[in-house]
Amino acid sequence: MSRITCPITDCKCKCNKNNCVYCVMGRQGLPGPKGSSGNSIYVGTGVPSPFLGNNGDLYIDSSTGLLYAKVNGVWVPQGSLKGDPGASGSKGEKGDKGSSGEAGLKGEQGTKGEQGDQGEQGDKGDKGDKGDVGAKGDQGDKGDQGDVGAKGDQGDKGDQGDVGAKGDQGDKGDKGDQGDKGDVGDPGVKGDKGDTGDKGDKGDKGDKGQNGSEILFGLGIPSPDLGEDGDVYIDTLTGNVYQKIGGVWVLETNIKGEKGDQGDKGDTGSKGDQGDKGDQGDKGDQGDKGDVGDKGNKGDTGSKGDVGDKGDVGDKGDKGDTGDKGDKGDTGDKGDKGDVGDKGDKGDVGDKGDVGDKGDVGDKGDKGDTGDKGDKGDIGDKGDKGDIGDKGDKGDIGDKGDKGDVGDKGDKGDKGDIGDKGDKGDIGDKGDKGDKGDKGENGSGILFGLGIPSPDLGEDGDIYIDTLTGNVYQKIGGVWVLETSIKGEKGDKGDTGDKGDTGDKGDTGDKGDTGDKGDTGDKGDVGDKGDVGDKGDVGDKGDVGDKGDKGDIGDKGDKGDLGDKGDKGDVGDKGDVGDKGDKGDIGDKGDKGDLGDKGDKGDVGDKGDKGDVGDKGDKGDIGDKGDKGDVGDKGDKGDIGDKGDKGDKGDVGSKGDKGDKGDVGDKGDKGDVGSKGDKGDKGDKGDVGPVGASILFGAGVPSPTTGENGDSYIDNSTGVFYLKINDVWVPQTNIKGDKGDKGDKGDKGDKGDTGDVGLKGDTGTPGSGPIIPYSSGLTPVALAVVAVAGGGIADTGASYDFGVSSPSVTLVGVNLDFTGPVQGLLPNMAWSAPRDTVITSLATAFQVSVAISAVLEPIFLRTQVYRELAANPGVFEPLAGAIVEFDVASSALISVGTVFRGIVTGLSIPVNAGDRLIVFANTRTTSLISVGTVTGFISSGLALA
């Protein structure tokens, strides 16, 4: 055979005289591995969920400023990002004592005369008898019952049975035999060898490495189009920190250091001496009892005086004759409402009025028309259909036709055609896939820990933050290099407030002149309510009044208008039961008794005439259902079918078909499989994943050639933070906390109060405020300790107050929660502030009651003041700053009786009247320790201004 020309352009074939091996392109290589993700920074409120984030990620608690790092699946506290507050300014000096107070005021007005006694209430008239109600008319007769429905019709006769089927026709005769098959054809020619397979595709490009989270900077609120989810944005004007979550910038916290505390307010000047109290004037004679004045506005209830001795009950006077009916008096002023008196005896029941004449019984209504005839009974069920007649007998099968004659043998088939050319050989196997592209480079990681980083930790370019000191390291050439510290500098101590001006001393009040004995005053106008007077002397017991003569019985007076309801007074003593009065003459029947005429309603009985109306009376009972119709006669049995015709004789068998053409010769053998194509070229190396934005450090302004766009740079000498944008280093903010503001100048001392009238001057206000003492009492408190790698703050502790403690109180997030069916049953030891005040300091001591040995790692005792949330009663939040923390177990052996102390001063935390405060103690650790609890007695003192 001739040489075969390779159909592939520029192919380097290895040909021989029989075939050619085509070069095959190798398969496409696998994609390179995805570059490692940069670490993410999360911001939220409270302790992070264990399901949030991956190892190496960061979390900022915006409520406390605590920074956490995820290590081996656990969020470990690293430290606080907020700078320390500046120191408080010095307390201003105490003001000078105020001058003496002004002259005393004129003495108070004399006491108002007592109110006259209230008149007795008249007897209530007898109630008239109620008339009898007339009799009700009789009800009309019920209509007659309807007739029974008619009997249902008889059912229809059943259908006639079907006629039997006709018999089957006889079978057709058999077909003649087929002729013999022709001879098999010759085998076909073997097919050509298949073509060489194509070269495999080029391997895929490796995946791009994933960017790390970016830290962005700007002035003001970030644009929604800025950054990607997980990025952090710092507003350099305010220090606010935002995180992009779900495409939205969410405000999380503020990184600027706290402003220094304001200097203490200067002491208030001493209060001036109060003038001596003037001598009390002689008590004036009691004025004549004044007329009852117009009722004044009801004053506040004064202190209740002693109840005077009860006067003797005077003899009951004879009932006087009823005087002529007086003119109706004006409605008196509404008196104070007396307490409900004891219930009087029940009056005698009045005589029953005469029974009204019974109304005539209405005429009996005419008998109602006969009710409509009952509905016709339902038609009886249709009779059952007659049975289907028996099917006629099947006709006899006709005789089978005679078998046809065997056909002549068919002619021998023609020789089969040459077999088809064998299929082209399969394409050679595709070349091996190209090698996987190189892995993209990882983004830089941010790591956290306690103390100097281990040389084995991290990779070149990674950042490490020591959460104990705030020192920032970068790994360069396998070595951790100290770069800077991110903790803000402590604010300068505020200047001492200027000394308040000395308050003017109040003038000493002149001694009041002894008051002259007052003349009996005219009846005064109703004045404003005065202050509650001193308790009056118990009045002398009154003389028993003379018994009055019995008056004549007068005409019964008209019922007076109902007076305004008096205010409720004190419950009076139960009076003696009066003698039963003589039964009065039966008065004219009260108007209400006329209602007895209503008895005419009995005439309504004529309504029975309604029966005359042709309206259908009560519906007659439904007629009985008609009897079920008789079952129809059974249908006649069907006729027997006719016997089938005898089958026709079978046709003579056809001549056998010509023998089939011989089979096509066997297909030639399949061509050999083409040679395997050459291995494909190695896929191109995947692009290197973008390196996470780098954080660089240096002293001074960064060089334009340093770093790449998106990198950050921290000037160690100033704390200025730069971001490289379009090849230019742009200052963004300063990560060091702002220096605390200078303490405000102390307020000028208040001017001394003017001396009070008459009374001896009070001692000046003490220089310091009250102290609220707290103690866990007679029983020591066992506080739980977090004993895991990295340590942490225990969420279970104890509250305590004035000699009592409640152990096993659990924080909910950062708050104390005394609500709900479980927490609501815990003792709530909060107390309420009775006035506005300010917390100035907190001190705590802890006395060990169970020895602690071989700890050698710090265990910090924490006590903090919590305040109830106004919007959520029963839930208390921690007061920032009102916390004391000290180490109780960092030496080899802590024996029973050892005392540890801590104090925080210079606080200025306002507390409003009505606020509820509670003190809570728990522990904090920084590493794995072997102690599960620390036990002892806790005491604290809270200083208020």
From Swiss-Prot:
Source taxon at top rank: Viruses
Pfam families: Collagen
Domain Collagen-like: 83-142, 146-205, 257-376, 383-442, 488-547, 554-613, 635-694
Compositional bias of kind Polar residues: 703-712
Keywords for the protein's UniProt record, in alphabetical order: Collagen, Glycoprotein, Hydroxylation, Repeat, Virion
Compositionally skewed regions (Basic and acidic residues) per UniProt: 109-145, 168-208, 488-687, 736-754
Region Disordered, residue ranges: 80-226, 257-441, 488-712, 733-768
Post-translational modifications: May be hydroxylated on lysine by the viral-encoded procollagen-lysine,2-oxoglutarate 5-dioxygenase.
Residue stretches of biased makeup (Low complexity): 756-765
Glycosylation sites: N211, N442, N716
Predominant location: virion
Cellular component per GO, a single term: virion component
Compartment list: Virion
NCBIfam families linked to this entry: exospore_TM (TIGR03721)
Its job: May participate in the formation of a layer of cross-linked glycosylated fibrils at the viral surface thus giving it a hairy-like appearance.
Protein name stated in the entry: Collagen-like protein 1
Native source organism of the sequence: Acanthamoeba polyphaga mimivirus
